[in-house]
């Protein structure tokens, strides 16, 4: 009888430990795969790279630094629409970039142009702030250091530029040469049966020096206009938000979007 009692005690003890571990595991999984900015990072550069990887800069190291310095909203922050409503599908966002939305037209391609323009404006490179509209007409910024004029210019750009103009304006870049600031972009006109195009910006790149493998942090805006946010990697929740890049792939699945390899562009 004593042996049975001892066995039962051990059995139920193990069962309790397993149940507790399972509960904690589920809670941890939910916290890290559903909570926005679960570790309360301050900037994109605070998001750690997986073991064995090292961050790499692009041709313009200052641009890489700028993107990594983008501020993030705190733990639990939601992606909000320009209208003030909460966006649907919050689980697609890993962290919200702390930048105000400038207009109801600031959508996916506009978000990419916004980040590029913000970098050039911050560096005082005003003459380089220019984007093409859908008719290939170049819209040049002429407002100098005035923040008011800068935002006014961007709102005008948003009204006449989109994924179509952005995909034509930027230069195609091979996947093997990907760098921070690059853009995955396709226009609706490039996809049979597609009503909308989409654009996603590469905001960070890391490389494993031993294997040569690269991983990416991605950010996007979307329709309707909403906060720019770092995307969650739904396919690898334990590595979220880093996406593994297959440089030999013809097609890439980035969250819920699919891109062709030849749809990577650089400035």
Predicted regions and their residues:
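Residue microenvironments linked to proteolytic maturation
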Residues: 94
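Low-complexity, Gly/Ser/Thr/Pro-rich intrinsically disordered linker/tail segments
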Residues: 215-217, 221-267
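Mature, folded catalytic cores of secreted/periplasmic enzymes
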Residues: 72-75, 84-89, 168-172, 192, ...
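...with weaker cross-activation on analogous glycine-rich loops/strands in unrelated enzymes
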Residues: 148-214
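Hydrophobic alpha-helical membrane-insertion segments, chiefly the h-region
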Residues: 18-28
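Extracellular-facing segments of soluble proteins and assemblies that are Gly/Ser/Thr-biased and enriched
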Residues: 97-177
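N-terminal Sec-pathway targeting helices
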Residues: 2-19
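N-terminal module-boundary/linker segments of secreted carbohydrate-active enzymes
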Residues: 29-89, 102
């Amino acid at each position: 009888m004593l042996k049975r009692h001892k066995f039962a005690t051990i059995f139920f003890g193990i069962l309790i430990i397993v149940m507790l571990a399972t509960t904690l595991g589920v809670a941890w999984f939910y916290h890290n795969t559903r909570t926005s900015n679960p570790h309360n990072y301050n900037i994109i550069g605070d998001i750690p790279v997986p073991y064995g990887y090292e961050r790499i800069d692009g041709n313009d190291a200052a641009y890489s630094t700028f993107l990594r310095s983008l501020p993030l909203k705190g733990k639990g922050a939601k992606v909000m629409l320009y209208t003030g409503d909460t966006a649907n599908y919050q689980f697609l966002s890993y962290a919200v970039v702390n930048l105000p939305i400038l207009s109801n037209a600031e959508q996916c391609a506009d978000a990419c142009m916004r980040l590029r323009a913000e970098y050039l404006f911050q560096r005082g490179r005003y003459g380089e702030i220019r984007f093409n509209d859908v008719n290939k007409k170049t819209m040049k910024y002429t407002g100098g250091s005035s923040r008011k004029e800068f935002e006014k210019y961007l709102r005008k750009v948003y009204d006449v530029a989109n994924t179509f103009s952005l995909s034509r304006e930027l230069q195609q870049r091979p996947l093997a040469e990907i760098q921070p600031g690059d853009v995955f972009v396709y226009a609706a006109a490039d996809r049979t049966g597609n009503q909308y195009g989409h654009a996603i910006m590469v905001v960070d790149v890391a490389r494993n020096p031993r294997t040569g493998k690269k991983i990416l942090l991605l950010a996007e805006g979307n329709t309707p206009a909403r906060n720019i946010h770092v995307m969650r990697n739904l396919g690898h929740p334990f590595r979220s938000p880093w996406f593994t890049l297959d440089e030999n792939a013809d097609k890439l699945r980035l969250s819920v979007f699919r891109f062709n390899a030849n749809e990577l562009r650089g400035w």
